[in-house]
Regions:
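Extended, solvent-exposed, turn-rich assembly/linker loops in the middle of proteins
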Residues: 105-106, 112-114, 136, 140-143, ...
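Beta-strand-turn-beta hairpins that frame and shape the catalytic cleft
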Residues: 1-10, 125-142, 199-202
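Short, flexible loop/turn elements at secondary-structure junctions
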Residues: 14-17, 129-131, 145-148, 208
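Conserved beta-sheet core of the metallophosphoesterase superfamily
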Residues: 140-141, 147-241
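Charge-rich, low-complexity terminal tails
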Residues: 88, 93-104, 226-243
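Short, conserved, surface-exposed binding loops centered on an aromatic residue
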Residues: 117, 126-136, 161-166, 196
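Alpha-helix termini
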Residues: 35-38, 129-135, 188-197
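Core catalytic region of metal-dependent phosphoesterases/phosphodiesterases
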Residues: 3-120
């Protein structure tokens, strides 16, 4: 329950890539300041918070600006002023590199230091807000890091829509593709209390990154992604995406 706020805003923070040459520290600083200042603004973490370049990975260890340990230290210290407003975290493929090589889940370590809910694969949130007099608004939000490529908007949208095969939710959110893509659809669900079918709207969102263009993306001829993040706006039982 996020309190008596008439509306709620959530930043889906993903693909920060601390330790990468193109990491935009100013952008992260501004996000933390904004969350600290605004009472009804919260954060969900979607993985790849650190770049975690290893000798066995695609990332270049020689251009890294921090060691993996320094990256972990940075991300557990930086958001301390707002950690009570971080709703939870999932892991990304960059953190998973250490899980595969050494059996250490860096995302779990980060979540433990921040004292926030964590799952390596996905988290489902039941968000409630509003006053008792007007009734609480309820939303179900499914979050995961995501995987794979997909250069076109259509390919990215297809990846997003596949999330709806896993569970029924009001909003599906993923990261990984460094691009803001959003759309909605609808499906009929049974209302057994009233013996009817109800049309339910579902919203899909892939979020951006904290990474300036260059490095691996430029070498692989990938087009520039979305630097920055959308806002999830929850109000009156409706989901709106602000880009």
């Amino acid at each position: 329950d996020l309190g008596d706020h008439e509306s709620i805003y959530i930043i889906p923070l993903s693909d920060v890539h601390i330790g990468e040459e193109g990491f935009n520290e100013t952008l992260l600083d501004n996000i933390i300041k904004m969350v600290k200042k605004q009472d009804n603004l919260f954060v969900v973490l979607l993985g790849d918070l650190i770049n975690n370049a290893l000798k066995t990975s695609k990332s270049d260890v020689y251009t890294a600006t921090m060691t993996p340990q320094q990256q972990v230290n940075y991300i557990v210290d930086k958001p301390k002023p707002i950690r009570h407003k971080i709703l939870g975290s999932v892991s990304g493929n960059h953190e998973d590199r250490t899980s595969k090589d050494a059996g250490i889940d860096l995302s779990a370590v980060i979540a433990q230091f921040l004292d926030i809910p964590y799952d390596s694969a996905s988290l489902v949130y039941q968000i409630k807000h509003g006053t008792k007099g007007s009734g609480k608004n309820n939303y179900v939000i499914y979050t995961t890091h995501g995987f794979g490529g997909g250069g076109s908007k259509g390919a990215k949208a297809n990846k997003l829509q596949k999330l709806s095969e896993l569970c029924l939710a009001d909003l599906y959110v993923m990261g990984h593709i460094h691009d803001i893509v959003t759309f909605s659809d609808a499906v009929y669900v049974p209302d057994t209390r009233h013996d009817r079918m109800v049309l339910k709207k579902r919203t899909y969102l892939s979020t951006g990154s904290c990474l300036q263009y260059g490095g691996y993306a430029e070498k692989m001829l990938l087009r520039p992604g979305s630097e920055g993040y959308p806002l999830i706006h929850l109000s009156d039982g409706k989901v709106k995406i602000i880009t």
